[in-house]
Amino acid sequence: MAASVPWACCAVLAAAAAAVYTQKHSPQEAPHVQYERLGADVTLPCGTASWDAAVTWRVNGTDLAPDLLNGSQLILRSLELGHSGLYACFHRDSWHLRHQVLLHVGLPPREPVLSCRSNTYPKGFYCSWHLPTPTYIPNTFNVTVLHGSKIMVCEKDPALKNRCHIRYMHLFSTIKYKVSISVSNALGHNTTAITFDEFTIVKPDPPENVVARPVPSNPRRLEVTWQTPSTWPDPESFPLKFFLRYRPLILDQWQHVELSDGTAHTITDAYAGKEYIIQVAAKDNEIGTWSDWSVAAHATPWTEEPRHLTTEAQAPETTTSTTSSLAPPPTTKICDPGELGSGGGPSILFLTSVPVTLVLAAAAATANNLLI
């Protein structure tokens, strides 16, 4: 009897291990996929479990707070994009998986924006579309093209998923084209359509390889060249005209030149020494609209190289002084009477630095006065 107890314990443990193994490795039911609108409230039931069943909810492997539960149901309010994920409901005691929901939060589509353009005239045209706002969930688009009552094939672009191409069946047709597009997702659908004449959607791609160069010895000229867009299939039969605009970087106002033919132009009124920005657009000679502007080219008109002048070394300046033969202006000095002796005779004024003849004349005049 004592020996049977260990055997019983082993049997229980083996059964438990088998149950755990079976739970982990048995194939599980694929999760239910559910789409809900952004901002809405949603209630997720725990599969077929009763309302009062003891369950635990997880999202992406993380336990959810019990206050989000109403019985066994999970309540999510004011859905945000972050609520998207894999929700799983487990039996609280055995952790047996009861139910899974893969929740996607998004929006129904708004009216799509549709446009058509022929940049390969006369081969065909393409139509492209997009939604004005994202839906955050997968969308399906369906395009229908009619030429009168005839349905035309719209071949999907291999690189751009929101574009398809249509070949012209009849050139210069007066019958209008009608293009319709519908979009749908799990939360709703929408449609739009446009009608147009063949010639109204012709719009070439911008000119290519726009290059601007200075003209040697011409400080106000720039030579501009470009190429016809490579997507334009037959420029000989369907020639293009061009529109050139240019301005110095220091100004905001453009100058324009329309050219009926050719792929080159010389600007003759550029500001000397100022950098310029140049762009070119293209248009069919007869129909359609102007292309977008090309990639900008930059150039500065020719400027003369500064000259480096070599000069001979200047000789050091020499100062030549000459002595004037004229004596400097005389200075007058009144002699001190004490220097003339102690006699009581009249004082005699001596002018120093005065020519001798003047001194002698003054002495003679004094003597005559004494004799009188």
Swiss-Prot record:
Molecular function via GO: ciliary neurotrophic factor receptor activity; cytokine binding; signaling receptor binding
Where does the record say carbohydrate is attached?
60, 70, 142, 190
Quick one: a GO cellular component term? ciliary neurotrophic factor receptor complex
Q: Which residues form the Ig-like C2-type domain?
A: 27-104
Name the PANTHER family on file: CILIARY NEUROTROPHIC FACTOR RECEPTOR SUBUNIT ALPHA, CYTOKINE RECEPTOR
Protein name stated in the entry:
Ciliary neurotrophic factor receptor subunit alpha
Keyword terms, alphabetized: Cell membrane, Disulfide bond, Glycoprotein, GPI-anchor, Immunoglobulin domain, Lipoprotein, Membrane, Receptor, Repeat, Signal
In terms of CDD domains, this protein maps to:
FN3
- From which source organism is this entry? Mus musculus
Q: What does this protein do?
A: Binds to CNTF. The alpha subunit provides the receptor specificity.
Q: Where is the composition biased (Low complexity)?
A: 311-326
**Where does the signal peptide begin and end?**
1-22
Q: Which residues form the propeptide in this entry?
A: 343-372
Q: Which GO terms describe its biological process?
A: brainstem development; ciliary neurotrophic factor-mediated signaling pathway; motor neuron apoptotic process; negative regulation of motor neuron apoptotic process; positive regulation of cell population proliferation; sex differentiation; skeletal muscle organ development; suckling behavior
| Entry-linked Pfam families | fn3
